[in-house]
């Protein structure tokens, strides 16, 4: 009966596996619970779920992933647009710090610019220094030469006028031309009546070893009111000339001119014995000697006095 029930219950397994397999499965107690057919197996709930619901679940998962990707992409685009309109978290801290430090940074930038400008102004380049020095060296001799040439020209004109005794428009025109060419500073101020002893036109003669003698003779001639002018200053000019002769290394030009004039005045034609025997001329003929002394003194004054001072006097 028991065997009959087995055959009725498992007819398919007997036909497939044979009698030996049925016998072996009967000997195993767990065969009734786990199922006798191990090769093909029997339909269970797991197999049914896998066969029916697995494709559905896979489709739902794929759809959810696709939807999540699209939703995340839209969310990222929206957040990027919001970032452009609104600062990110912590940006306000950076902005406040920058606005706090900006005045100090601006002050430092201004100080650096001022310091750089002052350095460039106080320290000119080497080329500029060289150009300034060369311009100064070149301009000084030109001015000195011009003053010397104008003084010599004025002296020559006045000496010629004194020698010839003429006073016409020609000499006035020459004086005007010399005055235009001369740019030397005036030593005598007629408004205040003072003499500038530091004037370059005096050639530094007021400060040399014979400066006191020169000042005495020059001031006497300037303030003289006698006719002819400077008649009372003859002794002072002679003292000045004697001082010049004591220092020939400094006043070589002045001593040379005075010696030439003395030699010219001392040269006189030799007289014959007949002339020596002749009686001397009356005293009235020798009355011209003081005038000759005055002429010589005026020539000496002209040689020592600049043109600008002579014209003002």
UniProtKB/Swiss-Prot annotation:
Residues 140-150 have a biased composition (Basic and acidic residues). Disulfide bonds join 199-201, 210-243, 220-233. Residues 74-313 are mitochondrial intermembrane. Residues 116-169, 255-313 are annotated as: Disordered. It holds the Pfam family CHCH. Its main location: mitochondrion. Residues 268-289 have a biased composition (Polar residues). Its cofactor is Cu(2+); Zn(2+). It is found in: Mitochondrion inner membrane. GO terms for biological process: mitochondrial disulfide relay system; protein import into mitochondrial intermembrane space. A motif (Cx9C motif 1) lies at residues 210-220. Residues 1-61 form a transit peptide. The chain crosses the membrane at residues 63-73. Cu(2+) or Zn(2+). Keywords: Disulfide bond, Membrane, Mitochondrion, Mitochondrion inner membrane, Oxidoreductase, Protein transport, Redox-active center, Signal-anchor, Transit peptide, Translocation, Transmembrane, Transmembrane helix, Transport. The keyword Calcium does not apply. A motif (Cx9C motif 2) lies at residues 233-243. Residues 207-251 form the CHCH domain. It comes from the Eukaryota. Monomer. Required for the import and folding of small cysteine-containing proteins (small Tim) in the mitochondrial intermembrane space (IMS). Forms a redox cycle with ERV1 that involves a disulfide relay system. Precursor proteins to be imported into the IMS are translocated in their reduced form into the mitochondria. The oxidized form of MIA40 forms a transient intermolecular disulfide bridge with the reduced precursor protein, resulting in oxidation of the precursor protein that now contains an intramolecular disulfide bond and is able to undergo folding in the IMS. This is Mitochondrial intermembrane space import and assembly protein 40. The gene is mia40.
């Amino acid at each position: 009966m028991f065997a009959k029930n087995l055959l009725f219950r498992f007819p398919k397994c007997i036909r497939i596996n044979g009698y030996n397999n049925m016998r072996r499965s009967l000997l195993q107690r767990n065969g009734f619970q786990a199922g006798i057919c191990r090769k093909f197996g029997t339909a269970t709930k797991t197999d049914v779920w896998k066969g029916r619901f697995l494709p559905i679940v896979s489709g739902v998962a794929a759809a959810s992933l696709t939807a999540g990707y699209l939703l995340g992409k839209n969310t990222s685009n929206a957040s990027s647009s919001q970032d452009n309109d609104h600062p990110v978290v912590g940006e306000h801290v950076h902005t406040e710090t920058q606005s706090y430090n900006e005045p100090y940074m601006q002050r430092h930038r201004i100080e650096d610019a001022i310091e750089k400008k002052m350095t460039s102004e106080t320290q000119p380049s080497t080329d500029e220094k060289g150009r300034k020095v060369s311009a100064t060296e070149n301009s000084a001799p030109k001015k000195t030469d011009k003053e010397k040439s104008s003084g010599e020209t004025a002296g020559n004109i006045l000496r010629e006028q004194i020698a010839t005794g003429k006073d016409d428009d020609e000499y006035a025109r020459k004086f005007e031309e010399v005055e235009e060419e001369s740019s030397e500073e005036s030593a005598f101020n007629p408004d205040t009546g003072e003499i500038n002893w530091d004037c370059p036109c005096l050639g530094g003669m007021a400060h040399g070893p014979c400066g006191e003698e020169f000042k005495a003779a020059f001031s006497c001639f300037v303030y003289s009111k006698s006719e002819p002018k400077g008649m009372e200053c003859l002794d002072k000019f002679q003292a000045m000339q004697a001082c010049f002769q004591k220092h020939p290394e400094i006043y070589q030009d002045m001593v040379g001119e005075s010696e030439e004039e003395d030699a010219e005045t001392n040269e006189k034609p030799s007289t014959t014995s007949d002339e020596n025997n002749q009686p001397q001329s009356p005293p009235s003929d020798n009355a011209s000697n003081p005038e000759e002394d005055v002429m010589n003194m005026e020539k000496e004054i002209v040689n020592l006095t600049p043109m600008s001072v002579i014209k003002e006097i």
